[in-house]
A protein has these predicted regions:
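Noncatalytic carbohydrate-binding groove/subsite architecture in carbohydrate-active enzymes
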Residues: 140-147, 174-305, 312
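Bacterial N-terminal signal peptides that target proteins for export
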Residues: 8-23
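Aromatic/acidic polysaccharide-binding cleft in carbohydrate-active enzymes
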Residues: 278, 282-384, 390
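Acidic, Ser/Thr/Pro-rich beta/coil linker or hinge segments at domain junctions
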Residues: 417-471, 475
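Conserved, mostly hydrophobic/aromatic
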Residues: 60, 95, 166, 226, ...
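N-terminal catalytic cores of secreted or lumenal carbohydrate-active enzymes
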Residues: 37-221
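Carbohydrate-binding surface patches
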Residues: 377-420, 426-435, 478-484
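N-terminal signal peptide c-region/cleavage motif recognized by signal peptidases
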Residues: 31-33
C-alpha cells in the first residue's frame, strides 16, 4: 500500500483526473494532499502613476567584433532579412555595441566600411545605437575620426557614444580612468561639437565612479544617461547543478540583489533627475549558466527583471547577446543569448519570449500592483506589474514562477478599481508541459517565434471573466499571463 500511495502522489500532480483520483484514494482509506489552485488577489492602484516606460526600454548588447565580416559576410547588414525581422518582432529599439572585445588590443577595430554595414542594419531594423570606442590603449584621433564619420552619416540612428567597457577591471581608480577617458572624449568633441555620450560603463563593483562621472560631466549637457552593467547571479560557471540554478534564477531573493545594487548608485541620480540605463546585463556572466540561462526559467526571469528596473526608474536594459561572447579575453558559448544563428535564420531562445511579452504590455506608466495570496500560501512565488497607457488601457502582467513538482497554479482576481473596465484580452507565455527546463517548444499566444522572425500575434478574449472592473484568470505554475483591459 505505501508504494501505491507514493505512485498516486506523484501522478495526481497537475492531472486532469485529480478529483477522481482523490475520491479513489479516500475510499481506500488513504489521505493524500490535494493540490488546488491558490486564490490570489491583485489590487491595482492607478491614483499615483509611477515611471513611464521608455519606448526603447528592452535592448540588446553585442561585442564590437560582431561588426566585423566573417568570411566576407556581415552579421549586421541591411541585407540580413531574418535578423531585421527578429529585431522587429521582438521590438528591439536600442542596440549597443561594445563588450569586452572593444577594449582588447588583440581584436581589430571596425573600419568605416564595417561601420557603414552596421548602421545600414540599424536603419533597416529601425533601432537606435549606443556606439562604443576603445579605451584600453585607445587612440583619440582614430576614435574622433570614426565619430565624425558616424555623426555625419548616421546621426538619425545614433543615441550616443560610449568609451570603453568595464574599465574598473583594468584601471583601479576614477582618477586613473579619467586620465585615459578624457583625451578620447575631448578629441571627439573637437570634431563633433554636438556629440552625446554615456558612461562610465562599469561592473557592479564600482558604483561610486558613476557619481564622480556625473559630477564632472553631466553639467555639460553632453551626457544622455549614466550607464552601468549587472549580472545579478555572478559567474555562470559556478552553477554546477542546473535544478538549483533554475531555482536560484527564479528566487524572490533576486529582488534583494537588484535593490542592493540600486541603492548603491541610483538614489543620487534620482534626486538630481539624472537618467540611467543598464547598458549591459544578463543573469550570469561569462556567457551564462548551462541548462539555466538557456531555459524557460530565463524567460520568466527576463520579464520580471525588465519590469523591476522599469519600476525603479531605469531608462532601459540591454541584454548581452551573440552566438559567442567574451568571457574576459576568451570566447565562451552564449547560453544567455536571446537568439543564436541557425541555418534558416536565428533560433530564438527563451529570453526573447520574455522580452517580447514585456514589449506587448510595456505601454505607458507603471502603476501600483499589490499581490495578496491566500493566507495558506503566503510564500506563493508570483509577482505582478501593471502599466496604464495614455488611453487608459490597463496592462497587468502576472508571472507565476512556481515550478517543478511542487509548483502551484494561481486563481487570480484582479481588482482594477474601476467598473469602466468591461472588456479585455489575455496572452499567455508557456513552456511545453510546464517544464521550467524547456529550451524549445515555447508558445506565446499559442505560437512560437520562428527562425525567420515570424510570429502570429493572437490574444484571447476575457469574455465573462471580467465584470464590474474585476478580472478572474488562472495563471498555471511556470507561466506568464498578460492581461489587457480597456474601458467601455
Amino acid at each position: 500500500m505505501p508504494s501505491l500511495y507514493l505512485t498516486l502522489l506523484r501522478f495526481m500532480k497537475n492531472n486532469r483526473l485529480l478529483p477522481s483520483i482523490q475520491l479513489a484514494v479516500t475510499l481506500m482509506g488513504l489521505s493524500l494532499p490535494l493540490w488546488g489552485d491558490v486564490p490570489v488577489t491583485v489590487t491595482i492602484n492607478t491614483a499615483a502613476p509611477g515611471a513611464k516606460i521608455a519606448d526603447d526600454f528592452a535592448g540588446l548588447s553585442y561585442e564590437t567584433t560582431r561588426e566585423l565580416p566573417d568570411q566576407g559576410k556581415y552579421y549586421f547588414s541591411a541585407q540580413n532579412a531574418p535578423l531585421i525581422k527578429i529585431f522587429q518582432t521582438l521590438g528591439i529599439k536600442n542596440l549597443r555595441v561594445g563588450g569586452n572585445f572593444v577594449d582588447s588590443p588583440r581584436k581589430a577595430i571596425p573600419t568605416e566600411p564595417d561601420i557603414d554595414e552596421f548602421f545600414g542594419f540599424a536603419a533597416a531594423a529601425d533601432t537606435k545605437v549606443i556606439y562604443s570606442f576603445r579605451l584600453n590603449h585607445g587612440d583619440p584621433a582614430a576614435s574622433a575620426a570614426q565619430a565624425k564619420h558616424i555623426s555625419d552619416k548616421y546621426s538619425s540612428s545614433l543615441i550616443c557614444y560610449s568609451i570603453g567597457n568595464e574599465p574598473d577591471i583594468y584601471v583601479h581608480s576614477y582618477k586613473g580612468w579619467l586620465k585615459e577617458w578624457q583625451p578620447i572624449y575631448d578629441a571627439i568633441n573637437q570634431v563633433v561639437p554636438d556629440a552625446k555620450f554615456c558612461g562610465p560603463s562599469l561592473t557592479s563593483n564600482a558604483q561610486p565612479w558613476a557619481h564622480d562621472f556625473v559630477r564632472d560631466f553631466y553639467p555639460s549637457g553632453k551626457v544622455v544617461y549614466v550607464v552601468q552593467h549587472q549580472y545579478a547571479g555572478g559567474a555562470g560557471g559556478k552553477i554546477t547543478d542546473p535544478v538549483a540554478g533554475r531555482d536560484l534564477l527564479l528566487s524572490p531573493g533576486w529582488h534583494d540583489i537588484y535593490q542592493k545594487y540600486y541603492d548603491k548608485f541610483v538614489p543620487p541620480l534620482k534626486a538630481a533627475n539624472i537618467p540611467y540605463r543598464l547598458e549591459e546585463a544578463n543573469n550570469f556572466y561569462n556567457g551564462g549558466a548551462k541548462d539555466v540561462s538557456d531555459t524557460f526559467a530565463s524567460a520568466m526571469w527576463g520579464v520580471d527583471y525588465l519590469y523591476w528596473w522599469a519600476d525603479h526608474g531605469s531608462q532601459g536594459i540591454n541584454f548581452h547577446n551573440g552566438d559567442e561572447v567574451a568571457a574576459g579575453q576568451i570566447i565562451a558559448p552564449c547560453r544567455y543569448a536571446s537568439f543564436t544563428s541557425a541555418p534558416d535564420g536565428y533560433f530564438v531562445h527563451p529570453l526573447s519570449y520574455g522580452i517580447k511579452l514585456f514589449n506587448l504590455g510595456a505601454h505607458g506608466q507603471l502603476v501600483g500592483s499589490t499581490v495578496a495570496p491566500d493566507d495558506a500560501a503566503k510564500d506563493l512565488n508570483l509577482v505582478s506589474y501593471a502599466v496604464l497607457d495614455a488611453d487608459k488601457t490597463l496592462y497587468v502582467t502576472l508571472i507565476n514562477k512556481e515550478h517543478d513538482a511542487n509548483g502551484r497554479n494561481a486563481e487570480v482576481t484582479i481588482h482594477t478599481g474601476s467598473a469602466s473596465y468591461a472588456q479585455g484580452q489575455t496572452i499567455a507565455l508557456t513552456a511545453p508541459g510546464g517544464d521550467v527546463s524547456a529550451k524549445q517548444g515555447l508558445l506565446l499566444g499559442g505560437d512560437s517565434i520562428h527562425d525567420d522572425g515570424a510570429w502570429q500575434e493572437k490574444w484571447t478574449d476575457l469574455g465573462a471573466s471580467i465584470s464590474a472592473g474585476d478580472i478572474h484568470v488562472k495563471v498555471p505554475a511556470c507561466s506568464v499571463l498578460l492581461v489587457k483591459v480597456t474601458t467601455k
